[in-house]
Amino acid sequence: MNIVIDVGNNYIKIGAFSGGKLQWTKTYSRLHDVLQAVQAEKPVHVFISSVRNQTDFSALETVTQVHFLNKHTRLPIDIDYETPHTLGTDRIAAAVGAATLFPGCNNLFFDLGTCLTHGFINTKAVFEGGSISPGVEMRFKALAHFTEKLPLVKAEKEPPLTGKSTSGSIMSGVLNGIQFEIEGFIEAYQNKYTPINVLLTGGNASLFEKRLKEPIFVIAELNLIGLNRILNYNV
């Protein structure tokens, strides 16, 4: 069994793979709980994509082989990016996940987490880059933090088109703004690359999956699938 770990800014998601198939996933907020869960499984390999220091996972090295996704890791895709040393491992994992699920295709993927990112990987499995902008909670918090009177608002699945209150106007601006941002990118890529798959992942993907006009694939485990593919490519 392989276990892959995707450490984000707020949560840690782990997935167990056996025979190339995803068996289960779990999400944690505390690193201690992750270490306990992995140690209990006794996997053959552990592969980690993390925004934290590698020493945080040193306890796992006593029970199994631990590998980290970094700039030295061999990848099953090519990277066409001017600053590859700054490319986030989460974006690499998502790109590999897209190419694994839809090989030989143009794939446009959006990760709706702390940040809203998009990436594009072409039919030749070349990741060409994408964009980074504030995510849902970051936009709400920025409006409350950088103004005197605007309240902190929580996301709802059905924001109004026309806000009839300050909270409603914020809801409309943030959620409709993100929707139109995503749809704008989709249209621009469709005009240049046909056909193209559109994938959504990340904790806030559920807020938008039914609101986008174009057919999309919502794949919560996209990064985990990519990490397992990279692990198998290296061991």
UniProtKB/Swiss-Prot annotation:
This is Type III pantothenate kinase. Belongs to the type III pantothenate kinase family. It comes from Cytophaga hutchinsonii (strain ATCC 33406 / DSM 1761 / CIP 103989 / NBRC 15051 / NCIMB 9469 / D465). Keywords: ATP-binding, Coenzyme A biosynthesis, Cytoplasm, Kinase, Metal-binding, Nucleotide-binding, Potassium, Transferase. One of its GO terms (molecular function) is ATP binding. It comes from the Bacteria. It catalyses: (R)-pantothenate + ATP = (R)-4'-phosphopantothenate + ADP + H(+). GO terms for cellular component: cytoplasm. K(+) binds at D111. Pathway: Cofactor biosynthesis; coenzyme A biosynthesis; CoA from (R)-pantothenate: step 1/5. It is found in: Cytoplasm. The keyword Transit peptide does not apply. Homodimer. Substrate binds at Y81, G88, T89, D90, R91, T166. One of its GO terms (biological process) is coenzyme A biosynthetic process. Catalyzes the phosphorylation of pantothenate (Pan), the first step in CoA biosynthesis. Its EC number is 2.7.1.33.
